[in-house]
């Protein structure tokens, strides 16, 4: 099942978090539709900006939108003109005050969405798909990824029958919930049709969840500090507590042996 399901949804609450953080009762469907429209507005026409993900957080009067991008200068524009235009369009769409935060992706070579977008751009430019896939794999492994898998599906190389091919390097444990796996998907538009690009990047074991950390700390507090007693040291000449106890034990053993012999001799004499 781990091979088929989306890695982000499969690990919600374990290593990943929701990209939309809000609660609504009667307006739930309206907010979902609005979130889809916001993400479409930000990604359409901004392919060169390298947008990795868009996080949305809502309050009663305000909507906060965090845009993670590899090229923040393109999103901000000259003197912030592009950012002001985007903010105005979002406020017109939501009818609320919008707080727009543009965040830079520190390491785009191991961001799955950006890697998939880069491979798709090369396919649109008529670069050989195997060459584009291998180049993305080499860049990710050099940047510190523990493993990567890149898959292309469609009319590869202009073939009449569509097929899927993938290349993998390192480990990509899709069934391990604790594994920190990033997933990205992008479509390349070519003259032969669309080619889907999927990327899985394994970044290592994720740290413990907040619930696990709190449980471990509570168990440690309940156990309390444990005092370790130093073992008794034997002094030279037989002195010390350990030597006296051993002598007393040997004396008691000798007395018990003599008593047993005396009882046995008495029984034989009778």
Curated annotation (Swiss-Prot):
Record-annotated KH type-2 domain positions: 38-106
A Pfam family that the UniProt record links to this protein: KH_2
Family: Belongs to the universal ribosomal protein uS3 family.
Keywords on record: Ribonucleoprotein, Ribosomal protein, RNA-binding, rRNA-binding
Coiled coil, from the record: none
Record-linked SUPFAM superfamilies: Prokaryotic type KH domain (KH-domain type II), Ribosomal protein S3 C-terminal domain
Protein known as: Small ribosomal subunit protein uS3
Any GO BP: translation
UniProt source species: Thermobifida fusca (strain YX)
